[in-house]
A protein has these predicted regions:
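Residue-level signature of outer-membrane beta-barrel architecture
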Residues: 77-79, 109, 140, 154, ...
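Outer-membrane beta-barrel "beta-signal"
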Residues: 207-212, 242-256
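Detector for outer-membrane/organellar transmembrane beta-barrel domains
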Residues: 130-192
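Outer-membrane beta-barrel initiation region
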Residues: 23-95, 101, 108-109, 248
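Transmembrane beta-barrel strands of outer-membrane/channel proteins
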Residues: 57, 86-90, 119-123, 150-154, ...
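Membrane-embedded beta-strands of outer-membrane beta-barrel proteins
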Residues: 73, 105, 136, 164-166, ...
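Repeated loop/turn-to-beta-strand initiation elements of outer-membrane beta-barrel proteins
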Residues: 81-86, 113-117, 144-148, 173-178, ...
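Residues that define the transmembrane beta-barrel architecture of outer-membrane proteins
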Residues: 49-51, 67-71, 99-103, 130-134, ...
Length: 256
């Protein structure tokens, strides 16, 4: 009985010591009161949900004979770390057809301060045969703050594709920006229904001079080059279309 009493007394003493230590534990940092205020400091709100959208290219293109319309935009909703992206781009040609219509739905995860990894689906939806792809890629700011993105794609029957894009904003003044832009597409197999050949299929590049009326809206002018190569060029020639063109462009860029 004496041993049981001693054990009980020891347990009670340990519980008392633990309770006292808990009562004297330091206040968590996010509950500390700044000197001279009556409000607690709030933790960093890195889990707030934001919405962002940008129409990077909304432009007419012309070589003096055949005007085309080009769009390229994207938007996302999410936190600093996790986002859902929608991207869309394409051409409406002077004959009323739509081509190069690519629409992507991606989950985005930040992996470093400047780069995100993205995965999801791409749908080629325009006047030609519809194709659907699985997508995996990256997007971010490279050294010297070039905006770059590269994506690999895969679909049925062993078809693979890749796309790389890069652009940069040179601030000539606070409101006048010169933007070079480059995009290249590659495919592992030919797809005649979409006038796509294996290898490097097309390059779209341009130089645009933008005047920002404010940071969210700016009209621009410039020059753009579209080129089809290799087997893609052969397929395009068969239907009587041009394999390359240099065009004057004019449009607007806006974001929210």
């Amino acid at each position: 009985m004496t041993r049981l009493g001693t054990l009980f007394t020891t347990i009670c003493a340990l519980v008392s010591i633990a309770s006292a230590a808990s009562a004297q534990a330091p206040t968590p940092p996010d509950q500390l009161l700044p000197a001279g205020t009556g409000e607690a400091v709030q933790p960093v709100m890195d889990r707030m949900i934001f919405v962002h959208g940008i129409l990077d290219q909304f432009e007419g293109r012309t070589d003096g004979r055949t005007p085309d319309f080009r769009w390229s935009g994207e938007g996302w909703i999410g936190t600093d770390y996790d986002k859902f992206w929608v991207k869309t781009e394409g051409f409406r040609r002077s004959n009323g057809t739509v081509d190069d219509g690519q629409h992507e739905f991606l989950y985005d995860r930040a992996i470093t301060t400047y780069f995100d990894v993205q995965a999801g689906l791409r749908s080629d939806l325009d006047s030609r045969r519809t194709r659907n792809w699985a997508a995996l890629g990256f997007e971010g700011l490279a050294p010297l703050f070039w905006h770059v993105q590269g994506t690999g794609y895969a679909r049925d029957s062993g078809h693979f594709a890749a796309r790389f894009e890069a652009s940069y904003d040179f601030l000539l003044t606070n409101t006048l920006i010169l933007q070079p832009q480059f995009e290249v597409n590659l495919y592992s197999k030919s797809d005649p229904a979409r006038l796509i050949g294996a290898g490097i299929s097309e390059i779209d590049t341009g130089l645009r001079l933008r005047y920002e009326l404010d940071r969210k809206f700016g009209p621009y002018i410039g020059v753009a080059y579209e080129g089809k190569f290799g087997q893609t060029a052969s397929l395009v020639r068969r239907v009587g279309e041009s394999t390359s063109a240099v065009r004057f462009v004019f449009g607007i860029r806006t974001w929210f």
